[in-house]
């Protein structure tokens, strides 16, 4: 199939996207370029007067800040955020046929969930115990892991919080939810939590739940004689935990036990054309098979939230509106604006406004009905396509999704990302083939073939779905092969540091 050289995403669009560099005077699909148009950037299909809507994906993505001639380059020099965004149209929810493949090889857990990995977590309750947790994990990986080959590793879960904060309120609650979500995560075959002893975030908050005591232990460094003594004590406790976790074996599990966290970072002009909508297809397939997918990054859906609200019941829709209102207030109090989200890298890649970025970001959610909206790191209580509130900062958002129960992460990128998490494997999807080639060490699948080779989005989405099940069954991701995940646990820090 011949690849297109200019793409029009919706018949209503007043702009098209150049799929390769376009020279001044060159004509494609009836549009003659008045100036050079870089690959991934937008060209005006029609003339637009100052103040007119600039339309992409069939939605307003901005307004002309000056008169724009047909064939002109449309970007931040002549396109700006509107005073308010218009809801020009909405997608309708679709009921997709369930895919043929509906199982994976995972670890059955006592509470009915299934893990895609079998790590042992070494968790810090406070930053003061983080270095000790790192030392424990390193020593356990050196001395214990060779004896217990059915364990994926000892993962340090360390952070910079846990003290110097109030013991109540949004920030404290978010931290406790996050740590409890990791404590109970299906990808952990056992957990050891280490405190210092005098911190605000006390170990008494983290009682064992469904894990028997043989799988879950805690202690404070101050109570065992110091740092080196803590490492020795931890290894004593970890030996029986590791022996028990080593008995865990992969067995066939239904896709309904998969929970996919969806992320995008380093987006470019192709992200909303290739990787994001293709991931949306995979999300729909997962949901149709009974699984769960999580969309997040509230600042990055700003301007496109109506597309989610249209797919939700009244209560869920109101939760989304409340989240947007909270973020407007939060950003304003901290001298920021949701309107200013696109990063320099986003803009270099062809994204102009937060509305344009948001419309592409929401495409990751496919067309399935929105089944619920959850607070950051809140435990999910249903399957289907759901929304979890979070910042747009990738490691913070992914940390919350994993705490909510995600046992897989799918991460789309156009400029390039090296992200990887533990204990949930992270699949990297490139929006363009150039990135897939240049950063092949970090990319798991090339979605650029949608434009480069004319591969239909439905087929690309099916490929992603199959890869998700392969990864869930034990195939290593690029980030796992390199060893990412020890420094990517980043709970959302809300409020004052005292």
What function would you assign to each model-found segment?
Residues 413:
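Short secondary-structure boundary segments
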Residues 1-408, 417-498:
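Metallocofactor- and cofactor-centric catalytic cores in central/energy metabolism, strongly enriched
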């Amino acid at each position: 199939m011949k690849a297109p050289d200019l793409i029009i995403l919706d018949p209503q669009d007043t702009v098209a996207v150049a799929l390769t560099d376009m020279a001044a005077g060159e004509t494609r699909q009836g549009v003659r370029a008045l100036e050079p148009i870089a690959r991934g950037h937008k060209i005006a299909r029609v003339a637009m007067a100052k103040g007119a809507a600039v339309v992409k994906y069939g939605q307003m993505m901005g307004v002309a800040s000056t008169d724009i001639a047909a064939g002109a380059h449309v970007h931040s020099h002549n396109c700006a955020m509107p005073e308010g965004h218009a809801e020009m149209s909405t997608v309708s929810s679709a009921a997709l046929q369930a895919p043929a493949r509906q199982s994976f090889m995972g670890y059955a857990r006592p509470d009915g969930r299934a893990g895609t990995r079998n790590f042992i977590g070494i968790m810090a309750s406070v930053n003061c115990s983080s270095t000790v947790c790192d030392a424990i994990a390193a020593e356990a990986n050196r001395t214990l892991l060779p004896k217990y080959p059915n364990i994926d590793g000892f993962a340090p879960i360390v952070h910079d919080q846990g003290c110097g904060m109030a013991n109540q309120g949004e920030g404290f609650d978010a931290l406790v939810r996050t740590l409890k979500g990791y404590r109970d995560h299906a990808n952990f075959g056992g957990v050891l939590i280490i405190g210092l002893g005098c911190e605000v975030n006390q170990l008494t908050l983290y009682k064992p739940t469904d894990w028997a005591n043989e799988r879950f232990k805690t202690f404070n460094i101050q109570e065992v004689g110091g740092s080196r003594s803590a490492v020795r004590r931890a290894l004593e406790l970890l030996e029986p935990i590791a022996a028990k976790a080593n008995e865990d074996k992969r067995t066939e599990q239904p896709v309904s036990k998969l929970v996919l966290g969806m992320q995008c970072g380093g987006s470019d002009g192709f992200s909303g054309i290739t990787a994001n909508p293709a991931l949306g297809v995979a999300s729909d397939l997962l949901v149709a098979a009974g699984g769960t997918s999580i969309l997040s990054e509230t600042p990055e859906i700003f301007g496109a939230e109506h597309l989610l609200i249209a797919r939700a019941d009244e209560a869920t829709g109101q939760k989304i509106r409340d989240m947007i209102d909270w973020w407007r207030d939060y950003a304003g109090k901290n001298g920021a604006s949701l309107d200013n989200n696109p990063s320099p890298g986003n803009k270099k890649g062809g994204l102009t406004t937060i509305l344009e970025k948001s419309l592409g970001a929401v495409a990751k959610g496919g067309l399935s009905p929105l089944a619920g909206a959850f607070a950051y790191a809140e435990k999910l209580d249903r399957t289907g396509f759901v929304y979890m509130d979070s910042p747009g900062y990738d490691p913070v958002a992914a940390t919350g999704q994993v705490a909510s129960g995600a046992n897989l992460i799918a991460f789309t990128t156009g400029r390039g990302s090296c992200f990887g998490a533990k204990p949930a494997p992270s699949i990297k999807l490139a929006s363009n083939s150039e990135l897939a080639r240049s950063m092949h060490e970090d990319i798991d699948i090339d979605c650029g073939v949608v434009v480069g080779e004319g591969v239909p989005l439905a087929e690309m989405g099916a490929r992603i779905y199959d890869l998700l099940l392969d990864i869930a069954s034990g195939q290593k991701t690029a980030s796992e092969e390199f060893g990412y995940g020890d420094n990517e646990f980043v709970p959302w820090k809300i409020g004052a540091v005292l």
